[in-house]
A protein has these predicted regions:
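Nucleic-acid-binding surface
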Residues: 12, 78-215
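Short beta-edge/loop segments at beta->alpha junctions of small alpha/beta modules
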Residues: 10-95
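Intrinsically disordered, low-complexity and often Lys/Arg-enriched segments
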Residues: 1-18, 213-215
Length: 215
């Protein structure tokens, strides 16, 4: 009886788990079908159902040599040259989100152009990844982990313009913003509580007061 139960369990396990693993020709196809444009080894392990890291990296190296995948950073791979550079920027150091001048410029709060991608993370660092300069700005852990004012678009975390405004003032005491008309001040004061910082509260009230007086 015990032997029969064991045989049944093995049959069930193989049909349920092993049969669902990709066949040899489908490994690359699974990556190409994914909504991600940038993959870590951990991402690939989950997509392939493979726990052996050596097997994964060897297979990835084979695809890179064949020109079917692109290595964009140590431990990070892309489908091709058209990968999302913002996705890459938030995958190198995590947790992180796109913010500061990248958002402020896109949203019309600041008019100066920056070629760098600015990212809020847990460290200060400037790097170049596959020709793209990325500036990481250190934020306090409690602030970084609070998702108030953070939106996720196509798998990439983005600060809202109000969050980017506050983040910049949080790390830079004095800063010139070209256009505060586009900010929702109710949202600014809502997000402000995340920082628990008296100096920042005073600074934001000053910017708001000056803004109101010029209207």
């Amino acid at each position: 009886m015990l032997l029969l139960l064991l045989k049944w369990y093995l049959k069930y396990y193989i049909s349920t788990y092993m049969d669902n693993r990709p066949s040899k020709g489908n490994f690359l196809e699974i990556l190409l079908r994914s909504s991600k444009t940038v993959f870590s080894v951990q991402d690939v392990a989950l997509l392939w159902g493979e726990s052996e890291s050596t097997t994964i990296t060897n297979r990835l190296k084979k695809y890179i040599r064949a020109g079917k995948l692109l290595r964009v950073r140590h431990g990070l791979y892309a489908k091709d040259e058209n990968y999302d550079r913002y996705e890459l920027a938030t995958r190198i150091y995590t947790p992180s989100y796109i913010g500061f001048e990248t958002v402020l410029t896109r949203e019309g709060v600041s008019f100066q152009y920056y070629g760098n991608i600015f990212v809020a993370s847990y460290l200060n660092r400037e790097i170049e990844a596959n020709g793209q300069k990325i500036t990481y700005v250190r934020m306090k852990r409690s602030v970084l982990s609070d998702t108030t004012g953070i939106n996720h678009v196509n798998g990439v975390a983005w600060a809202t313009k109000e969050r980017a405004f506050l983040d910049r003032l949080y790390v830079t005491k004095e800063y010139h913003f070209d256009n505060l008309n586009v900010l929702d001040w109710d949202k600014v004061f809502e997000i402000l509580t995340v920082y628990e910082n008296k100096r920042l509260e005073k600074q934001v009230k000053k910017y708001h007061r000056n803004f109101v007086n010029t209207q």
